[in-house]
């Protein structure tokens, strides 16, 4: 990489479109990959030509103006063809990208807190301080994306530097069954067979927290009263073409943060213990009474949880399978959408971790409307596999509303019907009557016909960060009617989806 040092400031050219502006701390600069910026090594051999004079650096159409004080970034600016397009200001890390129609000429991303990640990732390596992670708070280290008001370019640059979302297994894009319910080995098997009798495809089944022995939803010992032989059940599910995901509400080990060796050891051993008997995926859920402990205020426990569950799963599959290992799949909360209420995307790391859901929502029409908006907002922020508790975690929708939910679910990134154990009707297609079942089955069949298109766009997302399902404004950012719509979206570039919800009428 090309760089220039001006006093305590390093200007680092990762490419002609990504510039790093770093203020040294104690006379040192940071060259290691970090939690927020894991892909520095991709830019090692990039060369950018520039000229330097007393007041700044000129490269291409741009000029970086030095601050008068060589020891601070305050006063640094960037000009494009003589016009100022960026002035440095202190900012927090965020994963909230500007809406496509409001993409700036320059987008700034802070790598603070800066967390240097050990080479072995999230894996126990003995009693090493913070398991080899090094946290540096309040650094001034900013990456500038010269995206020139191009929303697609910004997202491609963003995921190239901050990390792509893993391309999920094809099964994840198929049909799910998910419910907070105390299944037994027998009833879970009966449900799988019922899908077969109704000629409805099922690819993933969630066994919620009652799979475990502890009543508080903690620990990793299997509830032998419900599942006398868990390995036998997992083999049975696989023989029917169904992958199994366990829900986990983790508790910290003796108050330890996620980087402390005893926490890393406990989590790694136990998550991998169940993967070893045939479990396919983990659902990292918020705990009702406690949560994992973040070692820094700058990164939430939701994001660190996504990270550690992903890394532990990936490490296990890599050791088991070798170079062509099974792609890891995890599910966790969108950070930060709380029980269907969108707040913001709090950091630039959480988008990397595959399936993310919007929390325990309700079943009413307003909730459906919000979930459509959540899909659009999250997709615009490089979270491609956002999904809802389709049909509502709580409540009993009428038949028409149930159908609307299922139609939306089949035309969204992940089709995961879900509810709790208090509802009168489950979320299976046959839960109401034959007419309702037939309609839902038609839309499930439509989803499977669309799978080649969905998967093609999933690969495109992996390569360049373009959403699978995207806002109208993403493709038509200069059309005010398009970018103002929060109730319609597209699959790829050619299929318009307009769910009937809220005030919309047929």
Q: Where are each of the predicted segments found?
A:
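Extracellular/luminal recognition modules and glycoprotein regions
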Residues: 1-8, 14-16, 26, 31-33, ...
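A low-complexity, Ser/Thr/Gly/Pro-enriched, surface-exposed linker/loop concept
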Residues: 12-54
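Generic recognition of long tandem-repeat/solenoid scaffolds
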Residues: 2-6, 21, 52-60, 78
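Secondary-structure transition/turn motif
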Residues: 22-28, 58-68, 81-82, 119-122
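Hydrophobic residues embedded in beta-strands of well-ordered beta-sheets
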Residues: 18-19, 55-57, 113-115, 496
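A short, compositionally biased
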Residues: 1, 14-16, 51-55, 68-75, ...
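Catalytic-domain carbohydrate-binding cleft regions of carbohydrate-active enzymes
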Residues: 64, 75-506
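Short, well-ordered beta-strand segments enriched in hydrophobic/aromatic residues
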Residues: 11, 19-21, 61-64, 496-499
